[in-house]
């Protein structure tokens, strides 16, 4: 199933959720049902991959749990945000699904609107759960924890790492980056890789670029490594006007001014230019390898360079138990099953058909390299969250759709040279102040 951050966007739907929250509370069963062995699961139906992935998991669960029935309810939506709003409508109409698929960015949304049942009690009492969580990096637990409430186990996730074209590095005589490289070393490396082959003043190969249409593989690793975030720790206040954010955006803006990076572009264009050797480095999660392989293999990955600090930026997805569930105990068994070895193996993939996410189980993630799935440094995917500090919380307020579009719009003006970094961030902060609230 798709858990890449590039399509994780949310919608406020405040008026609707006022009704939905009440419906969820009135439907809340404090205990498990007796006799009923059925579950209904809602998921975002973004395409065949979503249908196939959810069906495979549901079929496997029913095969492993005789007598159970799992009904899958696909919910449409242009993005995660409209999907959430449509699920809210479903519950408000009286439907009682047991679980729903959410992205990590949706944690604040579902928690603030009282839609989900935290799993803290299950984690404390279930011995099998203790075995499972011991095999999951703490950062993945923290990513779905809001005000002490653990909302769900993460079945798959992506982190932000730097991809580099190994053929371009070799041709330019540049050594591969090391895990402890700094912003200054990154800048020097990008300059060495930038080349104007025809002397027209415009580089034919740039050292680095980033996505214009996404926050997480765009500015967030730089903001995190400058020691900042776009929201306060309680995700109640925008912090775009802080010195840390200014430092990160200024660094990227200078790359453009120095002509070692073009103006940021959509991620699909980044993929194309990277494979063509027109861009030497870019940032993303594991999902690009599904596009690259099996034809393109001249790539490897490394951590983002360290600034004032280093923090891994990541996000994942899970199946939280809804308060509308009539069978929460069975729903918990299903949630556990989504992180079982049987299911997690599908995220490993093969060299010809790799998974587009990282398994949440440490033991399964380690088999990516063992199975020969590129890149060579694939152990870094899990090490980035298992051995390094992470950016928590997600800068993802309940009104994430408005938040994201506002951030990207002002960044576009800055990187196009239509606004200075200081003025652009000041205007961004002004708009976000009414969007990021609690």
Please name every model-derived segment.
Residues 124, 288-296, 308-314, 321-406, ...:
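C-terminal lobe and pocket-closing loops
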Residues 75-86, 105, 181-187, 262-276, ...:
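Short helix-initiation/N-cap motifs at beta->coil->alpha
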Residues 170, 176, 386-438:
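Conserved C-terminal helix/tail region of periplasmic/extracytoplasmic solute-binding proteins
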Residues 120-136, 179, 198-209, 228-247, ...:
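Short, solvent-exposed loop/beta-turn-alpha elements that line the ligand-binding surface or hinge
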Residues 189-190, 234-264:
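Glycine-centered hinge/linker elements that transmit conformational signals in sensory
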Residues 145-155, 160, 170, 184-237, ...:
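Extracytoplasmic/periplasmic solute-binding protein
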Residues 2-113, 127-131, 329-330, 342, ...:
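Conserved N-terminal structural module of periplasmic/extracytoplasmic solute-binding proteins
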Residues 105-159, 300-303:
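Hinge/lid segment of periplasmic solute-binding proteins
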